[in-house]
């Protein structure tokens, strides 16, 4: 008998692969803002029941930061300091097929 089901939301950033780049930027803007809403809504829950989000690439997060409101920035930082929102260290995902000449 199944006693517990764990759900994990997952997103993946393929800039320009699944949709044109402007569409991907808009989608990730929505993802970040929805993550802020969910993290705030669940912040008072027990730690194992809180919503947590990691922005997968810094490129999307930097674009969102540049174009969002001061209120959203403040909310984002507050949640970051609580450990509910974080940002990965890679600006973009790079294909493992790239050699050093393609990266430079």
Segments from the language model and where they lie:
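Carbohydrate-active enzymes and regulators
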Residues: 1-104
């Amino acid at each position: 008998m199944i006693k517990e089901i764990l759900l994990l939301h997952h997103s993946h950033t393929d800039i320009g692969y699944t949709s044109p780049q402007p569409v991907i930027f808009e989608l990730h803007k929505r993802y970040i803002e929805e993550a802020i809403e969910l993290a705030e809504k669940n912040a008072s829950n027990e730690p194992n029941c809180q919503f947590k989000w990691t922005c997968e690439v810094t490129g999307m997060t930097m674009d969102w930061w540049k174009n969002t409101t001061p209120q959203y920035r403040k909310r984002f930082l507050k949640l970051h300091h609580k450990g509910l929102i974080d940002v990965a260290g890679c600006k973009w995902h790079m294909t493992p097929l790239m050699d050093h000449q393609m990266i430079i």
